[in-house]
Swiss-Prot record:
The lineage of its organism: Bacteria, Bacillati, Bacillota, Bacilli, Lactobacillales. This is Proline--tRNA ligase. It catalyses: tRNA(Pro) + L-proline + ATP = L-prolyl-tRNA(Pro) + AMP + diphosphate. One of its GO terms (cellular component) is cytosol. SUPFAM superfamilies: Class II aaRS ABD-related, Class II aaRS and biotin synthetases, YbaK/ProRS associated domain. The gene is proS. It comes from Lactobacillus delbrueckii subsp. bulgaricus (strain ATCC BAA-365 / Lb-18). Catalyzes the attachment of proline to tRNA(Pro) in a two-step reaction: proline is first activated by ATP to form Pro-AMP and then transferred to the acceptor end of tRNA(Pro). As ProRS can inadvertently accommodate and process non-cognate amino acids such as alanine and cysteine, to avoid such errors it has two additional distinct editing activities against alanine. One activity is designated as 'pretransfer' editing and involves the tRNA(Pro)-independent hydrolysis of activated Ala-AMP. One of its GO terms (molecular function) is aminoacyl-tRNA deacylase activity.
Length: 565
């Protein structure tokens, strides 16, 4: 490809609103252009990277026995009503009506659509296992689109779905998809960590995220040094090392605590450590159930874990008005003693083994001291409900947890029968008995993956693309376009190495302009044809090299084959 005819509108200055490095590089290099907030055009350079990435996905999916198809972008809302997900998705769903007033939506994901097809087609266990996928543009009405392709309102995604007649089949499908995803990420050059994750609105109980460490990441992952534990912070578990020595139970006593509207103020006023205070947090669950959560005051409630425990669609911390109406106490005064108004009391495991603690007295500006579990208050059940902290021991090898910001580039789920039971996807088993199909769901954010690659492979002046997804494998730069010897050599090299996808800079531009643009193209090999062309010598530079090296043209073939084959 001749650069003189290749549409690559580069920018000299970094746009002020581009915060992420990947966003800056893609704008400056002419990979993408914003159409509106969260919506981008993929210019030729960006589209080449996108298509090469999709080709890798297609190859690895085929190797894993996953079959490609395509579903419509516009879906009937009735399908999402049937699955029960429509009210859960909230304002991120793009909704519209057709001319007949029928509710429609733009698909953010396609579990319902695939399940509907399968429900009408799969009738016997003999038709399974089955694995399908598509690569398609998705839509989400993000409240704050940002960081370029990392959080957009329109994006390209691989979404796949598996259908099994048994749990054993699903387990194998899940493992096969995980292995295929790791191969995809390796070939695209992105470092990822598979981590324990929350399934969110997708349904199901078991899921793994593929997280790419990056400074601009919106997620945080918790890992240990030996690599035996990795989890999204939302689901991370740590070992609580605090232990209170057993002591004689004292008589519970109510004390006034005026102005103590925080744990720090309360601890200072009563001259006790936060570890001797049990805070009570009232949650309104699914807008009807009142659940009081107890946790040691030096810890914070993990609401994702709480959602899993309660198996609810929504929860929120009660407003001050709710507290006053239900308990007669304002913020800080709510407590578990005589809390008959609560539908359920759940406690974090940190509450066990505490003696003579401070709890809310059920009225404003008052606390009970020397309160004790079982004697003075109770909990209906205990669970790990706390946010893990960096440095705490992991639950596997008891090594200190390390927190890293990261980008979620993939997510796989064991959905079970979450969708198939509600949507009637059943089959006849070997005994002729009707059973719900067992599902898995699998996704890669393809355009987000491109941003993650740039975040990890950014250079001082551009990007060093991994060889399999680089827009061009070789970038030939001719220094003087009027020099016939240089032109002849550059054209010969372009033809000889055409299979590596060559970009030939044949523009009448200053060397500085050409080299600056070359940094943004980020080809694995840059060949400069200059003053030594008459002697059969060129300069070769890889993105990681400090300086270019001179190389005889006769040695180029072996050098390039070693780098790119």
């Amino acid at each position: 490809m001749r650069q003189s005819i290749f549409f690559m509108p580069t920018l000299k200055e970094t746009p002020a609103d581009a915060v992420a490095k990947s966003h800056q590089v893609m704008l400056r290099g002419g990979y993408i252009r914003q159409v509106t907030a969260g919506v981008y055009s993929y210019l030729p350079l960006g589209y080449k990277v996108l298509r090469k990435t999709e080709k890798i996905i297609e190859e690895e999916m085929a190797n894993a026995g996953v079959v490609e198809m395509i579903m419509p972008h516009m879906l009937p809302a009735s399908m999402w009503e049937e699955s029960g997900r429509l009210p859960k998705y909230g304002p991120e769903m793009f909704r519209l009506k057709d001319r007949h007033g029928r509710e429609m939506l733009l698909g953010p994901t396609h579990e319902e659509t695939f399940t509907d097809v399968v429900a009408k087609s799969l009738k016997s266990y003999k038709q399974m296992p089955l694995q399908l996928y598509q690569i398609q543009t998705k839509f989400r009405d993000e409240n704050r689109p940002r960081f370029g392709l990392l959080r957009g309102r329109e994006f390209v995604m691989l979404d796949g779905y598996s259908f099994a007649a048994s749990q054993e089949q699903l387990d194998k499908q899940f493992d096969d998809e995980k292995a295929a995803y790791l191969k995809i990420f390796k070939r695209t050059g992105v470092e990822v960590r598979p981590v324990i994750a929350d399934s969110g609105t997708m349904g199901g109980k078991n899921s793994i995220e593929f997280q790419a460490p990056a400074a601009v990441g919106e997620d945080t992952i918790a890992t240990n040094a030996s690599g035996t534990y990795a989890a999204n912070l939302e689901m991370a578990v740590s070992v609580d090392t605090f232990k209170q020595e057993p002591e004689e139970l004292k008589a519970m006593e109510k004390v006034a605590t005026p102005g103590c509207d925080s744990i720090d103020k309360l601890a200072e006023f009563l001259q006790v450590p936060a570890t001797r205070i049990v805070k009570s947090v009232l949650y309104i669950v699914d807008e009807k159930k009142k659940v009081l959560v107890l946790i040691r005051a030096d810890k914070e409630v993990n609401e994702v874990k709480l959602t899993h425990l309660l198996d609810c669609d929504s929860l929120r911390v009660a407003e001050t008005s709710d507290l006053e109406e239900l308990t007669g106490a304002g913020k800080g005064g709510v407590g578990p003693v005589n809390a008959d108004w609560a539908d359920e009391i759940v406690a974090d495991k940190t509450v066990k083994g505490l003696y003579n603690v401070v709890v809310g007295a059920g009225e404003s500006d008052a606390q009970f001291i020397n309160a004790n579990l079982d004697r003075d208050f109770k909990a209906d059940r205990f669970a790990d409900l706390r946010v893990a902290n960096e440095g705490e021991p992991d639950p596997v090898d008891h090594e200190p947890l390390k927190f890293t910001t990261s980008i979620e580039v993939g997510h796989i789920f064991k959905l079970g029968t979450y969708y198939t039971e509600t949507m009637g996807a059943k089959f006849l088993d070997q005994n002729g008995k009707s059973q719900p199909v067992i599902m898995g769901s699998y996704g890669i954010g393809v355009t987000r993956l491109l941003s993650a690659v740039v975040e990890q492979h950014a250079t001082e002046n551009g990007v060093a693309w991994p060889k399999e997804i680089a827009p061009f494998g070789i970038h030939i730069i001719q220094m003087k376009m009027k020099d016939e010897i240089q032109s002849k050599l550059a054209e010969d090299l372009e033809a000889k190495f055409a299979k590596y996808d060559v970009l030939y800079d044949d523009r009448n531009e200053r060397p500085g302009v050409k080299f600056n643009d070359a940094d943004l193209v980020g080809a694995p090999i840059r060949i400069t044809v200059g003053r030594d062309a008459a002697d059969g010598i060129v300069e070769v530079k890889r993105p990681g090299d400090d300086q270019a090296q001179k190389l005889a043209v006769a040695d180029l073939e072996d050098f390039i084959a070693n780098e790119l084959d």
